[in-house]
UniProtKB/Swiss-Prot annotation:
Entry-linked PROSITE patterns: EF_HAND_1, EF_HAND_2
Other comment: This protein has four functional calcium-binding sites.
GO BP of this protein: calcineurin-mediated signaling; cellular response to pheromone; conjugation with cellular fusion; intracellular monoatomic ion homeostasis
UniProt keyword list: Calcium, Metal-binding, Repeat
Assembly mode: Composed of a catalytic subunit (A) and a regulatory subunit (B).
Residues involved in Ca(2+) 2 binding: D66, D68, S70, D72, E77
GO molecular function, one term: calcium-dependent protein serine/threonine phosphatase regulator activity
Protein name: Calcineurin subunit B
Taxonomy of the source species: Eukaryota, Fungi, Dikarya, Ascomycota, Saccharomycotina
Binding sites annotated in the UniProt record for Ca(2+) 1: D34, D36, S38, S40, E45
Domain of life from the UniProt record: Eukaryota
Stated role: Regulatory subunit of calcineurin, a calcium-dependent, calmodulin stimulated protein phosphatase. Confers calcium sensitivity.
Annotated residues for binding of Ca(2+) 4: D144, D146, D148, K150, E155
Natural source organism: Eremothecium gossypii (strain ATCC 10895 / CBS 109.51 / FGSC 9923 / NRRL Y-1056)
C-alpha cells in the first residue's frame, strides 16, 4: 500500500467516526456503487443506495456529501458524509448536516427562500404554496433571534434541538 492511500486512510480515521475495519467495508461498498469505476459516485449511482432513491431529499443529501461541488461524490466525501449518520456522531454533527440540507447556497444561513424550497421538496403538493409560505414565514419569524430575516446555525439548532431530528439522522446499518 503506497503512502497516498495510507495517508487518506489515516485522515479518514482521524476525521470520521469509523474504525479501520468499517472504512474497509465501506470502501468495498463504494467500489460496488461506482459501477463505471470512475473513482467517484455520480447521481445515478448515488440514487442506487438502498433507501436513498425513495427519499425526497436525496438530491440535497448528495449535494451535501459533495463537499467540493464537483457533481460527484468521491470516496473521502462518501465516508465523511456517512460518518454523520453513524451512531458515534454527536448531536451537533447531525444537526450541522441537517442545517446544510437547508443551506442551499452554503452561505451559513437558511433564508426564507431556501427553507421554502426544501420544505416544498418534502411536502410536494400536499400544501398549497401560499400555505407553505405561511409556515416558512412563521418559522423564520419565531426562530430568527437576531432579526436578520434568516436562520443561523445556532438559531436553527435552538429551533430543532427539542425535536427528534438528531435521532432520525442515525442509521442502524450493517455496513
Amino acid at each position: 500500500m503506497g503512502s497516498a492511500p495510507s495517508k487518506i486512510l489515516e485522515d479518514l480515521l482521524d476525521d470520521t467516526n469509523f474504525d479501520r475495519e468499517e472504512i474497509e467495508r465501506l470502501r468495498k461498498r463504494f467500489m460496488k456503487l461506482d459501477r463505471d469505476s470512475s473513482g467517484s459516485i455520480d447521481k445515478n449511482e448515488f440514487m442506487s443506495i438502498p433507501g436513498v432513491s425513495s427519499n425526497p431529499l436525496a438530491g440535497r443529501i448528495m449535494e451535501v456529501f459533495d463537499a467540493d461541488n464537483s457533481g460527484d461524490v468521491d470516496f473521502q466525501e462518501f465516508i465523511s458524509g456517512l460518518s454523520v449518520f453513524s451512531g458515534r456522531s454527536d448531536k451537533e454533527e447531525k444537526l450541522r448536516f441537517a442545517f446544510k440540507i437547508y443551506d442551499i447556497d452554503k452561505d451559513g444561513y437558511i433564508s426564507n427562500g431556501e427553507l421554502f424550497i426544501v420544505l416544498k421538496i418534502m411536502v410536494g403538493n400536499n400544501l398549497e404554496d401560499e400555505q407553505l409560505q405561511q409556515v416558512v414565514d412563521r418559522t423564520i419569524m419565531e426562530n430568527d433571534v437576531d432579526g436578520d430575516g434568516k436562520l443561523s446555525f445556532e438559531e436553527f439548532k435552538s429551533a430543532v434541538e427539542t425535536t427528534e431530528v438528531a435521532n432520525s439522522l442515525t442509521l442502524q446499518c450493517d455496513i
